[in-house]
Structure formats: C-alpha cells, structure tokens
Amino acid sequence: MTNIRKSHPLIKILNNSFIDLPTPVNISSWWNFGSLLGACLIIQILTGLFLAMHYTSDTLTAFSSVTHICRDVNYGWIIRYLHANGASMFFLCLYAHIGRGIYYGSYLYPETWNIGIVLLLTVMATAFMGYVLPWGQMSFWGATVITNLLSAIPYIGTNLVEWVWGGFSVDKATLTRFFALHFILPFIVTALVMVHLLFLHETGSNNPTGLISDSDKIPFHPYYSVKDLLGLFLLILVLLLLTLFSPDMLGDPDNYTPANPLNTPPHIKPEWYFLFRYAILRSIPNKLGGVLALVLSILILALLPLLHTSKQRSLSFRPLSQCLFWILVADLITLTWIGGQPVEHPYIIIGQLASILYFSIILIFMPIAGLIENHLLKW
C-alpha cells in the first residue's frame, strides 16, 4: 500500500515541500532564514488577528484602543509588543535572507529572486501601514511625510496623494484604509511566499559553493527540519527577551503622544528597519531625486543577475568581492545610523557619501571585481 503522504493530493504537496524535498548536503545556517521568515509571518498574522479584534480604526479612538489593549485586555500587552517587536525580527531575518542571496549568488535564480523583491516591497508596505495604526505623533507625521512623497511624481502627483489620503490631509479616511490594507496584505504576502517556494523548488536550493549539487542531496526531514527548529527556538528566545525586558527599545517615544496635526515632532523618522532607505531619500536635496533614489535603492536588487560578471556563482572563493560585500554591509549600517540623526552637518555629507558608495558598490565595483577575479584565475 502506498504511503498516504506520497499519494494524497494535498499531503503530497506538503511532503514534496517539507519532508522528502532533496536538499544540498552542505547548506549552512544562513539558509535557516527562509523558514524563520515563515515563522515570523505566522506570528505576525496570529498576533495581528487578536489585536484587530480590539482595535478601532477611528482617529478619535485609535490611540485609546491601543492603550485599552495594553491595560484592559487579558495578555493584550504581550500580544501588542510581540506584534511590534515581531516586525523588527521579521526585517532582521529578511535582510539576512537577502544578504545571503547576494553573498552566495542565489539571485541567479531570477524567478525566485524577482518574486522575493515583490515580497520585500509588499512587506515594507505592510510594515509602514502598521506603524500608522497606533495614531501617535510619529504614526501621523510618518504617514504625512511618506505619502507626501507621491506628490513628487510629475503631473499626477497631487491628485495621487489626495486619492491615497481620501481627503486633503491624513485623516480618518486614511487611517481606515490603512487598517484595511494592513489586514489584507499579510495574506497576499502568504500567497506570494507560496509562489516564491514554487519557483525555488523548480530549481532546488543553491549552496555555499555555488556548484550544482544534484549528485549530493539529502531529504529535508529530519536533517534540516531539526536544524530549522533550532533556529526557530533562538528566534523565539530573542523575540521574548526583547518583548519582556525592553519592549520599547526599538520604538519611538513620540508615538506615546496622541497624534496632533498642529504640533510637528522635532525629528520625524521611520522605524529602524527603514532608516537606511530614509537616509538615501534625504541625501538628495531635490524631492523627485530623493524619491527616485529611494525606489532605485530597492529595485537595484532586480539588476543583480544582469550585473553578475564572475564565472563563479558564490563569493565563497572570491576575496575581492567578499571585501566589497562587507563594505556594503558596513555602509548600510552607517546609513541606518545617519537616518536616525537630525539633518545637520556632518550627518548630511556622511549620508550623501554613504548613499553614493551604496550605488557605486552594486553598479560599478562588484562587476569590476568579478572581471578582475576572472582575469586573476586566467578564466
């Protein structure tokens, strides 16, 4: 008799994705982040669902409904902070996942990579809208500043902004639609994740050497399911430590003040995971130029398969490119720091130099380093 997990139409899909999936024997812990992102998504959907049961998307009651969740709802405080800090863990895993993709040349699976970029944009949109919902000062002014960027689009910009706002300023209509979109987007993300996995399982996973590993594969379960479980325990440990000991560490104190359109905070800034994008946006004094730089800083990832000049896939055996990769990481950390600083000397010039370096490394230095390495190896 055939095993049910290999014959049942539904269970067969799960079996081929998580149990009998042929996996390269040599993938490292950097490959854990995919499953950790799945875990983060589940945590966010569950905690978000319980929060939505008590939240009201009205400008008069939104702030007090979040306070009510923390004070009066059973375990509301932990659900709220798991959700808020879960977003930080989500982006931490997301950036590690993208970094691993760049380091080991996973972008050479273009379908998987491009769906990944769409996923990144969708998750960023979801997180931005979620930040608006508590209706604190930073929520309101963050929404005002970021949605206002659409007005930089020539000809249709102003109409587009008012269409997004649902009026002539960020108000009740904006909050209501942001709540509706914030609720639906994680389910769209889940659907995109399935497409992402579908394309990944068409080609199979990459591995640290960047070589074809068809001849040397092992089943995903129990080898990697156990390894992923360890990563999951560590993720939950860090999330709980953050939530229980310093839940507000990554938040902004201004968001504990109810939104007031008549009082602008001295320094408007997004959550930490958007700070490096925000620094790139601010580094160009022109509004349209800044918006273009912001969009290109994300869409530049789609060019990576075209910019790959090396005859080796991974950076494992390419010291020049390795150096550039870690300079890029340091540059992104610098941009994150700059994004949180006020717009004054010397932060302005540091931000501009770091932004130029970001684009230069990806568009110029990495492709040249690949060609030099080919030449040194006489390939």
UniProtKB/Swiss-Prot annotation:
Membrane topology: Multi-pass membrane protein
GO MF annotations in UniProt: metal ion binding; ubiquinol-cytochrome-c reductase activity
Sequence positions that bind heme b b566: H97, H196
One GO cellular component, as annotated: respiratory chain complex III
Matches recorded under InterPro entries: Cyt_b/b6_C, Cyt_b/b6_C_sf, Cyt_b/b6_N, Cytb/b6-like_sf, Cytochrome_b, Cytochrome_b_C_euk/bac, Cytochrome_b_N_euk/bac, Di-haem_cyt_TM
Annotated PROSITE patterns: CYTB_CTER (PS51003), CYTB_NTER (PS51002)
A GO biological-process term: mitochondrial electron transport, ubiquinol to cytochrome c
Cofactor binding note of this UniProt entry: Binds 2 heme b groups non-covalently.
Requisite cofactors: heme b
Residue spans crossing the bilayer: 33-53, 77-98, 113-133, 178-198, 226-246, 288-308, 320-340, 347-367
Taxonomic superkingdom: Eukaryota
Subcellular location: Mitochondrion inner membrane
Subunit structure: The cytochrome bc1 complex contains 11 subunits: 3 respiratory subunits (MT-CYB, CYC1 and UQCRFS1), 2 core proteins (UQCRC1 and UQCRC2) and 6 low-molecular weight proteins (UQCRH/QCR6, UQCRB/QCR7, UQCRQ/QCR8, UQCR10/QCR9, UQCR11/QCR10 and a cleavage product of UQCRFS1). This cytochrome bc1 complex then forms a dimer.
Family per record: Belongs to the cytochrome b family.
The protein's role, per its UniProt record: Component of the ubiquinol-cytochrome c reductase complex (complex III or cytochrome b-c1 complex) that is part of the mitochondrial respiratory chain. The b-c1 complex mediates electron transfer from ubiquinol to cytochrome c. Contributes to the generation of a proton gradient across the mitochondrial membrane that is then used for ATP synthesis.
Protein name: Cytochrome b
The species this protein was found in: Dugong dugon (Dugong)
